[in-house]
Amino acid sequence: MDDFQKRGQALIDELKEHVLMTFSRDPRGSNNGPGLATIDIERLSGLGIQLDRASERKQEHWITWTILQRLIADGLVMPIYSDKTRYRRRQPTSA
């Protein structure tokens, strides 16, 4: 991996940490809360990207969604499926 690729990975890691910190800004995102919708996380974290032209596929939300999927895979966030998917921090496991 060259320096440019390393910087890209560092940016992804920063985004993951930033989104994780967002959960502590709203009690709904706590490990016993009802969860936050993707749009709530996007707004609280400041990751909303305003496009001049709205996309039918809502591509302006893909960054937040992708980071959430990575946090789920890492075991740090849990999806809650209902009428709309919501997310909350996972309960820390004791060692």
Predicted feature descriptions by range:
Residues 1-35:
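Short alpha-helical segments that sit at the start of domains
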Residues 11, 48, 83-84:
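Coiled-coil-like amphipathic alpha-helices with heptad-repeat character
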Residues 29-55:
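Short acidic, hydrophobic short linear motifs in intrinsically disordered regions
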Residues 55-73:
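Short amphipathic alpha-helical interaction segments
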Residues 82-95:
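Short, cationic-aromatic polyanion-contact patches
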